[in-house]
Every structure is written in C-alpha cells, then in structure tokens.
C-alpha cells in the first residue's frame, strides 16, 4: 500500500531515494497521515501542509546531526513518521504513546521540545552559536509559522541572530497567503538566484568594495532593497541581517530541494519564506482548516461530523456570558492572544466585532493592552489558557496588579488537559496567581457557578481571575439571571463528622462522591484568594482531619493557602493536601490522569483512610 514509505525507517534511508521518487513518497505519506489521524485524533490540517517541507529537510540535511527545531510542534507528525515512529502513530497522544509535539526524550531527531509558540528561532540560534564555539560544521534550522512569527519573542531572536552572524536558517511556513502563477514563477527564479553561491559571493564582494565609501555602500544597499522589495516582502528580514529568499511554493519539491541545497552551502543567517496550504491533499481540511486543526476520530471518506454536546463546555459558558454581559455593558471588550475558537470567542467576535481584539500570539502584549484599556475606563476581559498566561507573568504583576486595574482574566484549560500533555496543562495558575497582591482568584465548581463568578469578577474594580477546566461540568442547570457570588466565601455542601474535604473548583464533584462513603463534611471553597479564613477556622475546630483537594500543583497551591491560614492562627490540626505532584504529567485520558493522581472518588477515599490509619 505504501511501497516507498514502507522502505523508510530513518532519514538516512530517505536519502537513498531518487529525487524523482519524492513526489510519490509525499503522496504516500499524506495518505498514511490521514488514515492514522482518523483513527487516533490529533492535529491534521497543519500536518498536511508540511509534508513536502519535511521530506525536503530530511533529504537535504544530515539529521539528526543537523538540528531541526519545529516551532509549536503540532505539525511534526510527518517528521515523526520519517524518524522511526511510524508504528507509534497508532498510540499518538495517548497514555504511554508518542507525544503530539517534539520531545527530546522521545527521539534524537527531536532536537528541541516545543509546544508553545515562537521559541524555535531562539533555540536554533543557541544551537548555531554552540556549533561555532565547538568548531563543528552543523546546520541549525528553525521552522516557524506565520502566526508564531507575530510574537515578540520571534523578533527578539531575529534581531539577535543578525548581530551574531550565526549559521542559522529560519524557514517561515506561511499558510496565510497565496501566490498567483506569474508572481510565483518569478519568485521561484529569484529564490534560486538569491540562494545560490554566485549571488551571495557577489553581494559580499560588493559590500567589501563599497565599504571604503560608506555613502556609496548605503546607496547601493537601498537600491538593492528597493528592487527586491518590488517583488519580495523580505526587506524587513534583510534589515535584521538575514539573506531573504522567497516566497516559494512549499509544496513544490523540486524548488524546495534546489533552494535548500543552495542555502546549505551558504554562511551566515538565512531566511527562507515558503507558502503552504493547510489541509493540503485532503479536500475537507483544505476547505475548513480550522475545523480540521485538531480533530477526534473520524472516517476519512465522510470527514469530521461535529457531534452535538449534551451539555455545554465551560468554554461555551464563558462565550455565552461574554455576549450577554456585552449587551448590558458597553465598556466590555474581549481580548484573546490568537485563540478565538479555543477560548469560545467566535460568537462574540461576530456580534461585537468592534469590541473584539485578537492581538495575535502575543500574550505579553494582550495583558498590557488590557491594562491600558482599563486605565481609560473600559472593562477588559482577557480570555486565555492557563498555560499561556504564564508567558505574561511580568505584565500581570507590573502592568495590572501593581496598578490595581480592573482586568478580568478568564482562564481556560485549568488543571489537566489530557492528550496535549505537560506543555499545555494548567497545573500552576493557583500557585503563581495567589502570591500576587490585589488579585482575586476564584474557581467554579459547576456550570452555573462559572457564569455567576464571571459576572462577579466583572463587577469588581480590581484584577480578578476565574479559572475553569477543559471540557464539560457535572451538568448543573445554568441560571440566566446573573448574581453576585459572596466575595471570599465558601459554602458547606455536605455536613459530616470527623473529616472535612475542602474542595477547590472542579474537585467538588469527586469530593461529594467520596464524602458519602467517608461521612465527611464537604466544602465548596470557591475562592483561593481571598480565602474564607473564618470557614477554615470553623472547620478546624469541628473536625479531626482537614483535606484540601485541588487540580493544581500542591506546591504553593490552594492547600498551601489553607496551611498558611492555620499556621498564622497557631492552629495545630492534621492536614492532608491532595493535588498534582511535583512532576510533569504525560498525556493521557483526562479521567485516567485524575485517577492516577488520586483525585477521583477512589483516590480521595484511599488517601484519607491511609492518613487516618497513621
């Protein structure tokens, strides 16, 4: 079924093929990828767009000696297949299976672990400098998408790379533009010309010759930029000190191979701009690359058929609240760092386009942009994943909290996230948020509480974070009427005897289940800051054992807040802290992951009984 692909286990075998065979290999690889992802789920459209590029890179460069650094990394399935992990695709993103992103501990061909965007150029530059210091001729290649290129970190790295004059190749995978045939042909010719040794040598010689007359050099440089600028968009990258080549068709293996082979012979920073199409070769994905960005299992012949959910996900609850709140208050603006679909902002972006701001993959900018808007009387709501808010921690403190500005942070994907693994887990937000002065941190236990907490956060004139998990809640009916949740107050949901389970957010449901068997008092704590200290003291006075349960790292989390409260009052009581342990958790089924962490009904009961037996 796959005559060429079946012969390839590692890139060295790929390099034994004739160039004329590579288009067939691309077809086989694309077919295998569609069939494989259809069985497991995963990222599809982005991977279909990088088939030819992946083949060309491994064909021209001596991997793994030469270093490939894939930005974000969800487009590396073809790379994994060609580097000895084809059989592992059957367990992609599953517990014990291969990851959906590059991981150094998974393969020597994964030169650098990625999953968050815009890190590739910095990492590849570090590798290029290391090669120079170690006096080895080794190529470092960063492959970055047009979305990731919008982040400040990418431009910081470009700026530094040009100054260092390192042997670095940056490949911009641009799937947000198209080339008309005549312009494409012209640019293909220019790519061959500008990536060749003659052009590079002549350019350096001309610079040396004209360097004795600085005004002439500057005039020549501007003339070159003017001519190239008429047919290429690369002047910006030339200003950073790169030799810009492209744009070229990223699905044309002949031009890719020729251009990469030419670039391989050059010294100094090189920038190759390729144009690809997401979903290439699979019509449904080409027509709707957003739908096919991340998919569950599906039948290739039928495509992805969206299944109606029996109850709303927390993301949808947030999106609906945002629209309802916007209708009531014209000061509300919604901000997202390039996560419109994932954060539930599609409806808001359509109903309130003038108040919707997608700032690109720029979390730092998103937070400070919100702070500036808040200074002028607007009420910004920043919709962001827990793992991505980490990238704007300084802005959170310096620009929002110190100035005590009324910015609402709607923190999605708090806690474990399943198949995306440790890079996307929201394991740390309670710990890194609660130590910041002026900020209020709350977490809903169910769908209705999520809506009411968002409303409560919006009414405050101080920084506020509402963190909620991925997926759906326990199925509580949502009240459309919005009400204030008493600030810093928990609620007792079940009265017991010796044991008190202090549940934070999503952990209320398993605590209620465990509470019945343990005859424990179960408390919905609601807030980690301000913590309901009065309730904690009452519980300590009436019980033998307090148990804090949170979907956050134990270190510095909600349980630590309870412990600090007790210590400050000189209360000596047995305390058991349950949460995520001090290690990174691999991908897996969310329910199984919670079980492995001891955060389901069975795990909570087991831990409590073990502590009571001491």
From Swiss-Prot:
Domain of life of the source: Bacteria
Gene Ontology terms, MF aspect: 1-deoxy-D-xylulose-5-phosphate synthase activity; magnesium ion binding; thiamine pyrophosphate binding
Enzyme class, first EC level, given as a word: transferase
Cofactor(s) this protein requires: Mg(2+); thiamine diphosphate
Cofactor: binding details: Binds 1 Mg(2+) ion per subunit. Binds 1 thiamine pyrophosphate per subunit.
Gene Ontology biological process terms from the UniProt entry: 1-deoxy-D-xylulose 5-phosphate biosynthetic process; isopentenyl diphosphate biosynthetic process, methylerythritol 4-phosphate pathway; terpenoid biosynthetic process; thiamine biosynthetic process
Binding site for thiamine diphosphate: 74, 115-117, 147-148, 175, 282, 363
Entry-linked Pfam families: DXP_synthase_N (PF13292), Transket_pyr (PF02779), Transketolase_C (PF02780)
Swiss-Prot/TrEMBL catalytic activity: D-glyceraldehyde 3-phosphate + pyruvate + H(+) = 1-deoxy-D-xylulose 5-phosphate + CO2
Pathway involvement of the protein, from the record: Metabolic intermediate biosynthesis; 1-deoxy-D-xylulose 5-phosphate biosynthesis; 1-deoxy-D-xylulose 5-phosphate from D-glyceraldehyde 3-phosphate and pyruvate: step 1/1
Gene3D superfamilies the UniProt entry points to: 3.40.50.920, 3.40.50.970
Family: Belongs to the transketolase family. DXPS subfamily.
Subunit structure: Homodimer.
Family annotation (PANTHER family): 1-D-DEOXYXYLULOSE 5-PHOSPHATE SYNTHASE-RELATED, 1-DEOXY-D-XYLULOSE-5-PHOSPHATE SYNTHASE, CHLOROPLASTIC
Function: Catalyzes the acyloin condensation reaction between C atoms 2 and 3 of pyruvate and glyceraldehyde 3-phosphate to yield 1-deoxy-D-xylulose-5-phosphate (DXP).
Stated name of the protein: 1-deoxy-D-xylulose-5-phosphate synthase
Native organism taxonomy: Bacteria, Pseudomonadati, Pseudomonadota, Betaproteobacteria, Nitrosomonadales
């Amino acid at each position: 079924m796959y005559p060429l692909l079946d012969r390839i286990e590692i890139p060295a075998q790929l390099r034994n093929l004739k160039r004329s065979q590579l288009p067939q290999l691309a077809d086989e690889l694309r077919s295998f990828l569609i069939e494989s992802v259809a069985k497991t789920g995963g990222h599809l459209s982005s991977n279909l767009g990088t088939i030819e590029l992946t083949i060309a890179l491994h064909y021209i460069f001596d991997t793994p000696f030469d270093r490939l650094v894939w930005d974000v990394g969800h487009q590396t399935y073809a790379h994994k297949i060609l580097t000895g992990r084809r059989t592992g695709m059957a367990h992609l993103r599953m517990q014990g299976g291969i990851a959906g992103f590059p991981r150094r501990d998974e393969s020597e061909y994964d030169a650098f672990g990625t999953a968050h965007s815009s890190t590739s150029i910095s990492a590849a530059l570090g590798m290029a400098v290391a090669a120079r210091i170690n006096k080895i001729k080794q190529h470092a290649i960063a492959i970055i998408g047009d979305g990731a290129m919008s982040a400040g970190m990418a431009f910081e790295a470009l700026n530094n790379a040009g100054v260092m004059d390192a042997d670095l190749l940056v490949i911009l995978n641009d799937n947000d533009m198209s080339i008309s045939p005549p312009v494409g042909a012209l640019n293909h010719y220019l790519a061959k010309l500008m990536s060749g040794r003659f052009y590079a040598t002549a350019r350096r010689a001309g610079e040396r010759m004209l360097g004795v007359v600085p005004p002439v050099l500057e005039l020549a440089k501007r003339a070159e930029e003017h001519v190239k600028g008429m047919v290429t968009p690369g002047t910006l990258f030339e200003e950073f000190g790169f030799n810009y080549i492209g744009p070229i068709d990223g699905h044309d293996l002949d031009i890719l191979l020729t251009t990469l082979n030419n670039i391989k012979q050059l010294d100094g920073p090189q920038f190759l701009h390729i144009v690809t199409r997401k979903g290439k070769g699979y019509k449904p994905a080409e027509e709707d690359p957003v739908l096919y960005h991340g998919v569950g299992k599906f039948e290739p012949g039928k495509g992805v058929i969206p299944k109606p959910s029996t109850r709303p996900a927390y993301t949808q609850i947030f999106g609906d609240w945002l629209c309802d709140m916007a209708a009531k208050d014209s000061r509300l603006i919604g901000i997202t760092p390039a996560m419109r679909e994932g954060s539930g902002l599609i409806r808001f972006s359509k109903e309130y386009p003038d108040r919707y701001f997608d700032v690109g993959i720029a979390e730092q900018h998103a937070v400070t942009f919100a702070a500036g808007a808040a200074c002028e009387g607007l009420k910004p709501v920043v919709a962001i994943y827990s793992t991505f808010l980490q990238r704007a921690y300084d802005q959170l403190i310096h620009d929002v909290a110190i100035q005590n500005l009324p910015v609402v942070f709607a923190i999605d994907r708090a806690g474990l996230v399943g198949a995306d693994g440790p890079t996307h887990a929201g394991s740390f937000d309670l710990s890194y948020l609660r130590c910041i002065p002026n900020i209020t941190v709350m977490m809903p236990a169910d769908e209705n509480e999520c809506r009411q907490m968002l409303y409560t956060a919006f009414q405050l004139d101080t920084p506020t974070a509402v963190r909620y998990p991925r997926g759906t809640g326990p199925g509580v009916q949502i009240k459309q009427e919005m009400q204030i949740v008493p600030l810093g107050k928990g609620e007792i949901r079940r009265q017991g005897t010796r044991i008190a389970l202090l549940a934070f957010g999503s952990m209320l449901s398993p605590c209620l289940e465990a509470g019945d068997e343990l005859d424990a008092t179960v408390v919905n704590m609601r807030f980690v800051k301000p913590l309901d200290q009065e309730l904690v003291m009452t519980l300590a006075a009436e019980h033998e054992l307090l148990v804090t349960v949170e979907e956050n790292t134990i270190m510095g989390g909600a349980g630590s807040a309870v412990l600090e409260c007790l210590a400050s009052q000189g209360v000596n009581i047995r305390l058991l802290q349950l949460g995520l342990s001090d290690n990174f958790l691999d991908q897996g089924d969310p329910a199984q992951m919670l079980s492995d962490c001891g955060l389901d009904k069975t795990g909570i009961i087991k831990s409590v009984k073990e502590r009571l037996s001491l």
